[in-house]
Amino acid sequence: MTFNHPVKELIWVVQPRSYTDCKAAKKETRTSITTRLLPYVYDKPAVYEQWIQMNGQDRLERRYGDYFNKVQPYQHHTGFVPGVGVYMYSFAIKPEENQPSGTCNFSRVDTATIVMTMDGSVAVNQDTDDTWNVRVYAINYNVLRIMSGMGGLAYSN
């Protein structure tokens, strides 16, 4: 991940490639296409365990996929329940508030990685779903400083 600025929360989605490239839509009937759009099969998440590394060091120990899907949202959000296959990690105590309550300055992090072990029992069509797409989003801050009539960003590389 190559993010800059202080990040208060990471959100990522794991889906089989065929769920996102519309190839499945050509083969499915109208009633079964809605089930193909979900990022899991057999009501099980595809990720068995995952953890976050920064600059080669573990930021968190290995956690089951449900930790990032159920525990983190429960601890840091009000009334938000992500779907299966949507994961998050909050660096802030209260990420929903505008007032900062914790961040990780990704401007100072050279390498950040989410390491995942996929669940071998979750199988989709082996002919089309041989790879997985992972999309990572970051909610971040930056500060516009104005001094002596000149403006500039507080956090930059």
Predicted segments, located by residue:
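Flexible assembly/topogenesis modules
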Residues: M1-N157
